[in-house]
Structures are given as structure tokens and as C-alpha cells.
Amino acid sequence: MENKTEVVVAENANNQTQPERKKFDRKPNRRPQGPKQFQKDDFEEKVVTIRRVTKVTKGGRHFRFAAVVVVGDKKGQVGLGTGKANEVPEAIKKAVKEAKKNLIRVPLRGTTVPHEVIGHFGAGQVLIKPAKPGTGVIAGGPARAVIELAGIADVYAKSLGRNNPINMIRATIDGLSSMHTAKKVNDLRFGKPVIKTEKPKVEETK
């Protein structure tokens, strides 16, 4: 009995000397999942062109890479960005960051655009026309990337000027940014409703 009591007393003494460990709940330390975190994931990106540029200095030639990227959420938002860096991935990263700063809102009418428009930039001109459902995107080159990432599923697009990729993209974005909603097009076409006012009656003098 004496041995048992000594063991129990010793265990109690050890438990009293050891400090209590605090249990920390790690859940509050997690970052709140807000809409800003998912906003970046909603955007898709397409690399249009990557070219090597040369800068001649007194020390010699310096080679860098220039990337042109289009981003969009396929819900009416699209943007263009360019970036330069010594490595291709870094140039693409800079272009994507710039494209997200240059987003524009494109008014959609179902799966197509509200009306016909011609976008201009430099020597580039792009004609954009609405199409019936099921037509698809009839466009080529860089303009197709912009239209698809904007969320337009049925449309006609044709280049009327130079086929420089950057000029075509900027001309397409210029055309999409000048689009009006269906209601505004209706107001511009037929005019605002006219409110009829009755003329005041004038009593005839005998």
C-alpha cells in the first residue's frame, strides 16, 4: 500500500509541475474566402503572341521577350495586356496582370452582340456583326480570342484593315467597348417616347 500511495503522489506532483498546454484553434487563422479570391480564378487567359525584342546599348545587345495576352471571364468582361521580361513566363505574368487592369464590360444580347459595329485602332479595322444562335464564332486570328473570352458564342467578325495582331486585338476591343445595350439601341433608333401635351383652350370672343 505504501508503494502505491507514493506512486500516486509522484504522478500528481508531475502533473502539477507541467504547464497546461493551450489548444489553439487554427480555423480563425484561415484567410476568409471572399469574392476577391475567386475573381482571379474566374478569368481565363490566352497568349496571342510571344516575340523576342532586342535592345542595342553600348555594352552590346540585350534580348528580352514581349508577350501579348488576352484575359476574360466569358461573362462580358475582357481585357488586353502586354509584358516584357528576360524570361517568357515572367513576360506572360506581367501581361496577365496588365490585362486584368484593362478590363472592359461588353453588353451581350443572349449569345451574341446587340448590333453591328466597326472597331478602329491604327491601321486595323474589325467588323463585328450579330449572328443567330448556333452560328458559332466566325472569326479568325487574334479577334477570335477576344470574342471567345468575352463570352460571345455567335458572331461574325472580319478584318477590314491590316492584320497586325496587336492592332486587330485593340480594334476588336474598341468595337466591343462601343457596343450599346439593346434598350439604348432601341432608344437611339426610334428616339425617346414623345409625351403629348394638350394645347390650352382659348375662349372665343364674340
Swiss-Prot record:
Name by which UniProt lists this protein: Small ribosomal subunit protein uS5
Family from the record: Belongs to the universal ribosomal protein uS5 family.
GO MF entries: rRNA binding; structural constituent of ribosome
Region of interest (Disordered), ranges: 1-42
UniProt cross-references to SUPFAM superfamilies, sorted A to Z: dsRNA-binding domain-like, Ribosomal protein S5 domain 2-like
Protein encoded by which gene: rpsE
Organism per entry: Mesoplasma florum (strain ATCC 33453 / NBRC 100688 / NCTC 11704 / L1) (Acholeplasma florum)
Keywords per UniProt: Ribonucleoprotein, Ribosomal protein, RNA-binding, rRNA-binding
Summary of the function given for this chain in its UniProt record: With S4 and S12 plays an important role in translational accuracy.
Subunit and interaction comment: Part of the 30S ribosomal subunit. Contacts proteins S4 and S8.
